Amino acid sequence: MMQLKLEHYNIKIGQHKVLLNIVDAKELGVNPGDRVRIRGHQSLSAIVDTTDDMVPPGTLGVFTEVYEHFEDWDKPVEVVPSFRSKSAAVIKKMLDKKPVVQDEIKMLVSDIVDENLSDVELSAFITASYIHGMTDDEVEWLTRAMIDTGDTIEFDTHPIMDKHSIGGVPGNKISLLIVPIVAANGLLIPKTSSRAITGAGGTADLMEVLSPVEFSSQEVKEITEKVGGALVWGGATNIAPADDKLIKIEYPLSIDPYYQMLASIMAKKGAIGADNVVMDIPVGPGTKVPTVQEGQKLARDLINLGHRLGMNVECAITYGSSPIGRRVGPSLEVKEAMKVLESMEGPNSLIEKSAALAGILLEMGGAAPRDQGKELALETLRSGKALEKMKQIIEAQGGDPNIKSDDIQTGQYTADIFASTDGYVMEFDNKWIIEIARLAGAPNDKGAGVAIHKKRGEQVKKGDPILTIYAEKEIKLDNALATAQRTNPIIVEGMLLRRIPGTYGFQ
């Protein structure tokens, strides 16, 4: 045991970690990656790193996650070697493809949330599930543990409705229409959404154009019960916090383990008390689900997991080979969605998809008979009831309920991409559309993104603008434009694709 004084480094690193001078580490008999227990007015386990110059002997360097647990910073703390977390043994079992039990999964998720595992240990867990997969029981246990280790919302009124899109399609702004449509028909739909990680705008990024999106779980409940719906950022609610910690490791590895994805999606639905959930599964090249067959498997797995958790899940396999609507990027997409709410003016792909998925929820919730939900959704849009409900949601979340589509500002710097030939739009590259919008500044720069002037099958003439890039900063516009010119994300072909001459040519 050693008595050490504390020195705070005002940095959040996502885990309980401390710095020991190498002299003190040798005295304690610990190495980098080992654990120590810190005893002050409370006891805390932390992972060790060592240094020969950042902290002097007799001092324990602590980062913000540890700092927040202690109050008396003038008093020394006791530091003793600690045993490795039992979760490390569970992870090794998973790496060895050995079965685990529910209590082991619960302990593992608790250690993830409490930041008792190192990045190496988290990486091993992610790798194990990525390579070996998980059984149905293990996925259910993981989902339940993710729910139980975070905030939950318990509503007095049921049913609770929810919707989730698997993602991968640019411009998928449909939640901005679905939530007010469903809420306008007397159903509760507390939509917690993500911010974009690799996309040009998650639903939370979009809604932030209209109102604040960061609320506690209790505030989400109050907003939903007051106006029927909410569109908020899930990261502010502490719902399924284990998911955010796993994403931090998955992102640099560029992997998204299938069974962890299932648990992540369903944990967030379970935490808000959802009874009925519709899943949007876009399929096609460039999406997260390339084929209909893969979409059907994902649908079966989501429905099965929902059944195990007591949720009624329906899945919609949707067309994902080109953007939804004609705008990509927060302000551009919100402007497009608000125009639909205001006057039903907008791309058919946006209106049809939103009405179809909202219709499924209306049928699941008993607001519409079977096969009549879509028509009720369209009527809710046409009548202005969805717009009125959206205004109520915006106001309840602290925004201006009188905002109109024309009030929404887009990036001041623009550049066009022109068709290089007469012909028809044959193909979209979703990934490059998203990348161009991100290079322009989306989602952090709300006014950045792209406007798509011609969609698949539409005729163009040489010199017609087919894409406009919007940016708030000129240098970002230049970067996005250079990439668009290099990658050609919208393919235009003439009716004659290729001429192949005869073997002998003309005589």
From Swiss-Prot:
GO terms for molecular function: 1,4-alpha-oligoglucan phosphorylase activity; AMP binding; pentosyltransferase activity. AMP binds at residues 168, 194-199, 203, 264, 288. Its EC number is 2.4.2.57. Catalyzes the conversion of AMP and phosphate to adenine and ribose 1,5-bisphosphate (R15P). Exhibits phosphorylase activity toward CMP and UMP in addition to AMP. Functions in an archaeal AMP degradation pathway, together with R15P isomerase and RubisCO. Keywords: Glycosyltransferase, Transferase. It catalyses: AMP + phosphate = alpha-D-ribose 1,5-bisphosphate + adenine; CMP + phosphate = cytosine + alpha-D-ribose 1,5-bisphosphate; UMP + phosphate = alpha-D-ribose 1,5-bisphosphate + uracil. This is AMP phosphorylase. Coiled coil: none annotated. Belongs to the thymidine/pyrimidine-nucleoside phosphorylase family. Type 2 subfamily. InterPro entries: AMP_phosphorylase, Asp_de-COase-like_dom_sf, Glycosyl_Trfase_fam3, Glycosyl_Trfase_fam3_N_dom, Glycosyl_Trfase_fam3_N_dom_sf, Nuc_phospho_transferase, PYNP-like_C_sf, PYNP_C. The active site is at residue 256. GO terms for biological process: AMP catabolic process; pyrimidine deoxyribonucleoside metabolic process; pyrimidine nucleobase metabolic process. One of its GO terms (cellular component) is cytosol.
